[in-house]
Amino acid sequence: MIVYHGSTEIIKKPDVIHSKKYLDFGKGFYITTFEDQAKRWAVRKGMRQEKAAIVNVYELSEKWDGFRVLSFEKENDKWLDFVCACRKGQSLNKEYDIIIGNVADDDVFKTVDMYFRGLWDKEKVLGELRYYKMNNQICIANQETLDRLVVFKESYEVVNSDK
């Protein structure tokens, strides 16, 4: 399957070591099946770092037998607790090779943050989340899995039309 990663660099040899720790699914290499989402990620990173926005395109093998996969089909209490724990820095992803689920992007995380800070309960947050258009993310949580399943295809620069 073709997947995408938004960046400010051409990443022919992706790695986990450069990942930030406090992400939705913890430390890992994040990809998506939505090209437009990767473009938005790239543009956002490019604007913050004052660099070119680059989308890297990869082939992700779908031969996942033998890998430890955690898949969140939708936002539910397990997804919410997992994302909040990882965003606090807990290393829950070490139990898995691949984690799949929806993105707690800026808009979604504003809602999740209400739960994170104890202002809303789970039911309120999950009820609000159904109004958001969600995108997916795939976190490859360790280097061995990344090396075995992900192959670089190409990269291209995204022109930010907001400039």
Where are these regions (language model features)?
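Short, charged/polar surface micro-motifs in flexible loops or helix N-caps
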Residues: 10, 35-38, 62-66
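Conserved NAD+-utilizing ADP-ribose enzyme module
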Residues: 23-24, 44-163
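Extended catalytic/binding region for NAD+/ADP-ribose chemistry, centered on the ART fold
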Residues: 20-45
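Pocket-edge structural micro-motifs
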Residues: 5-8, 33, 142
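ADP-ribose/NAD+-binding catalytic cleft of ART/PARP-like enzymes
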Residues: 1-24, 56, 60-62
